């Protein structure tokens, strides 16, 4: 969207801009975060009754749902919070263009065992799913109907896998090269560090998605400087880069601190992420946050590395609570009949499947057919 750019342009010209989240909350996202964190409010209805107006909208409801998830270990489909989620979080999967969903199990650091590969392959074959390796070193399974998701995830969870959170505004992946274990150029064990970071920050809800990378040397095979948090090995330890991303407006991550030992590296990442989660605007990536926060990267460095605001212990404690309280979201669904009941195409006909879902398998790969959509009638004919 061009809205954030327009806001920054107007602000640079001295135009006073409202920080209100939407018509129902006059506070910014950061202000709402502080209200929730300081008051212990755990429901949207209480928050809007005490600090907002009306009944909410498609802007404020997902934002509040994210804030509630960032400040507790409650399941995102618990009680009234479930109704706040957008389409992807509502079914813990990414909706695709024909109404089916993708399934992405977590493969920490890109590691996967032969046994896990066999389970993934068998699941894909049994459910007729299209498979593809992602840019984040994971395996994506496409074409699952909503009612198939619990069946698919039960088999993956039983095999020791868990949600990869590809559907959420949260940590996605920690990409890594093979590092010093295998590569003759590697100076540190990048795989071990990537796995440790992914297991630490998995499930961490934030204003936008978070991607990380760990490279075992300066050759940068994991493309760490194109990530929100990038780690590059040195002979003395690790360089920490922050605020990178790809997408329509790619940004190179900037150096936050250099030659860190492993403990200091993790501590600084903890504080950086928690400071970002507390102060960023709605749907704001780390790169834009660094550019727009007062004082920029220098201020962030002072907060993270020098505790200039005196909140380092609080940030550390908040991350410790997240790590201790983490639970796999799909395992939580599989153990709860009430949550399982939502995975149907039609709530008034739970045993019926969506008849508009179809696929074209006549070409080199399986693709969705968009029945009832403009141009879909000739989709098969055009490939003949």
Model-predicted segments: where are they?
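Small-residue-enriched alpha-helical segments and adjacent helix-cap loops
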Residues: 9-11, 23, 27-28, 101-239, ...
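A glycine-rich phosphate-binding loop feature that marks nucleotide/adenosyl-phosphate handling sites
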Residues: 2-6, 173-177, 211-219, 286-299, ...
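Mobile "lid/hinge" segments at catalytic clefts and subdomain interfaces of large enzymes
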Residues: 216, 220, 225-287, 299
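Flexible, glycine/charged-enriched surface loops at secondary-structure junctions
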Residues: 45, 62, 76-80, 129-135, ...
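Charge-rich, low-aromatic oligomerization/scaffolding segments with amphipathic character
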Residues: 3, 33, 59-62, 68, ...
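Ferredoxin-type iron-sulfur electron-transfer modules and their immediate structural context
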Residues: 1-39, 46, 60-67, 180
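N-terminal basic/disordered segments at the start of proteins
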Residues: 80-113
């Amino acid at each position: 969207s061009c809205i954030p750019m327009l806001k920054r342009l107007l602000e640079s010209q001295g135009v006073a801009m409202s920080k209100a989240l939407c018509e129902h909350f006059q506070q910014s996202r950061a202000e709402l975060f502080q209200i929730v964190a300081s008051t212990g409010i755990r429901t949207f209805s209480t928050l809007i009754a005490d600090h907002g107006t009306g009944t909410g909208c498609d802007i404020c409801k997902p934002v509040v749902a994210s804030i509630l998830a960032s400040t507790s270990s409650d399941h995102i489909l618990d009680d009234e919070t479930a109704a706040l989620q957008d389409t992807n979080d509502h079914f813990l999967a990414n909706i695709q263009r024909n109404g089916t969903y993708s399934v992405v199990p977590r493969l920490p650091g890109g590691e996967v065992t032969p046994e896990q590969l066999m389970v993934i392959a068998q699941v894909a074959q049994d459910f007729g799913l299209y498979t593809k390796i992602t840019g984040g070193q994971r395996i994506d399974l496409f074409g699952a109907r909503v009612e198939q998701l619990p069946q698919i995830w039960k088999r993956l969870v039983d095999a020791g896998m868990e949600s990869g959170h590809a559907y959420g505004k949260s940590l996605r992946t920690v990409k890594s090269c093979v590092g010093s274990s295998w590569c003759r150029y590697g100076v540190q064990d990048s795989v071990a560090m990537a796995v440790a970071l992914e297991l630490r920050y998995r499930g961490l809800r934030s204003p936008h998605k978070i991607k990380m990378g760990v490279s075992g040397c300066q050759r940068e095979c994991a493309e760490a400087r194109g990530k929100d948090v990038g780690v590059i090995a040195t002979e003395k330890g690790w360089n920490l880069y922050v605020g990178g991303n790809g997408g329509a407006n790619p940004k190179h991550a900037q150096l936050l601190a250099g030659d860190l030992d492993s403990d200091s590296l993790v501590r600084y990442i903890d504080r950086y992420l928690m400071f970002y989660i507390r102060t960023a605007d709605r749907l704001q990536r780390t790169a834009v946050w660094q550019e727009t926060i007062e004082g920029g990267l220098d201020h962030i460095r002072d907060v993270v590395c020098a505790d200039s605001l005196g909140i380092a212990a609080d940030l550390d404690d908040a991350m410790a609570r997240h790590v201790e309280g983490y639970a796999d979201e799909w395992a939580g669904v599989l153990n709860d009949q009430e949550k399982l009941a939502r995975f149907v195409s039609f709530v008034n006909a739970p045993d019926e499947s969506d008849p508009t879902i179809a696929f074209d398998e006549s070409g080199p790969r399986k693709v969705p057919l968009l029945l009832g959509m403009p141009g879909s009638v000739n989709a098969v004919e055009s490939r003949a």
